[in-house]
Amino acid sequence: NNGFMLCAWYRGTPSLPSALAAAYGVVMASEEDPARPLNTLALPGIAVCASKDKTLRSEQESALYNGVAPVETGADGTTARIVRAITTYVVSSNGTADESLLDVTTVRTLIYVSRAITQRIALRFPREKLNDKTAQRVRSELIDVLMRCEELEILEHVEANLDKLLVERDSQNP
């Protein structure tokens, strides 16, 4: 149950689990857009399973429901393809069903935006004095980063949610 762990499943493949993990990593690393789904992408170098080992759609759905990312043989019969890239995160810390970090694209998008924000703040405010004007300048930079992410179609509805973006001094660590 981890938003940063992916468990791929391809029944009957003669390829080693480590090769399947490596192929998945190659596909994820080669995709520049963190928000673009990886569904149907081929896993290079993975041997296809025998037809008797192919998974049924109901088995794939069960795997997905339980935080396992199934792989299937493509229509051409020669390539292993991602069904849906998900993490093992299926329940929150209090034990209730939670899909918030299930899709790999969600986690990759969060990481991308977080790094973009961190890099911008480090670039614009490397040795900034903390005063009452700083918070508004930081907020302005954050809005710019978020709007650029929306232009790249990584985020949606940024302007509609700007009222929820709070930048304030920490009263316990002024």
What does each model-found stretch correspond to?
Residues 1-26:
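Strand-loop microenvironment adjacent to phosphate/nucleotide-handling motifs in alpha/beta enzyme folds
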